Amino acid sequence: MRLCFILFLLLSPLISEASQHIITVKTIHEIASDILYDDANYWLIFDIDDVLFEGAEALSHSAWFERSIQGMRALGTSEQEAWDTLYPDWLSIQRQGSIKQIETAIPLLITKVQNQNKIVFAYSERKVCAQDVTLEQLAKINLSFEKANLPYTSLPSNICFTKGVLFGSEIHKGPGLQRFLDAQPSLPEKVIYIDNEKYNVLRIGEVCKQKNIPYLGIVYTASKYHPPIYLPDIARIQYLYRQKLISNEAAALLSRHRLDK
């Protein structure tokens, strides 16, 4: 009997630990039914860049920002310093640029989940200062998360939850959602998180593990199968003429005629 009791004590943390599942999909259709027919009172959380939409120009695409940070780091700048230095340029470019929806089925899925009275919101690394342009971009593709009227206590000044969008002001996903969960009067029965980067999906999984929240992480790779928008040479030309952001086609024409020299 004593041995059984000891085994129970040793195994009980494993028994009570919340489940974690990570899957990779090419299209939202592969997982839509699982989400819609999940009986749990879950939160469905979407990343924004390269999941809901992507920049339609090489310069406005998230890849330009990422590559620019990598370039500054190669010169010895810290990741945080590079991010902070480039952010004003990135924000100005977002205000000028246009966007392309990744997959038309996503708004339909969001509407269906909202009609089930379940929580759906977006979570981005973007800074609080980007909230206006972000909400404008979402409106352009007729996406609204305003139904996610979640109560919460105070948040740090660099984190903001407005109109169903959580702005984490962070280089890497995780801390923003952690603080948001800390501010909740009650936790969800489950979190379903969709992001195009696996490392972000894993980080959110760690946050949910700490909170003992069952988790389904979805690595959403649809954008990788689209024709590339970010092209370094095109982005370079667009940066030269960034006072009025030109399209990839116009930049390619300038390149062919050597008008950028």
UniProtKB/Swiss-Prot annotation:
Q: Indicate where this protein resides in the cell.
A: Cell outer membrane
Q: List the keywords (alphabetical).
A: Cell outer membrane, Membrane, Signal
Pfam families referenced in this protein's UniProt entry, alphabetically: DUF2608
Q: InterPro entries recorded for this chain? A: DUF2608
GO CC aspect terms: cell outer membrane
Q: How does it sit in the membrane?
A: Peripheral membrane protein
Q: Which residues form the signal peptide?
A: 1-18
Q: Which domain of life is it from?
A: Bacteria
What's the protein called, per UniProt?
Putative outer membrane protein CT_371
Organism name? Chlamydia trachomatis serovar D (strain ATCC VR-885 / DSM 19411 / UW-3/Cx)
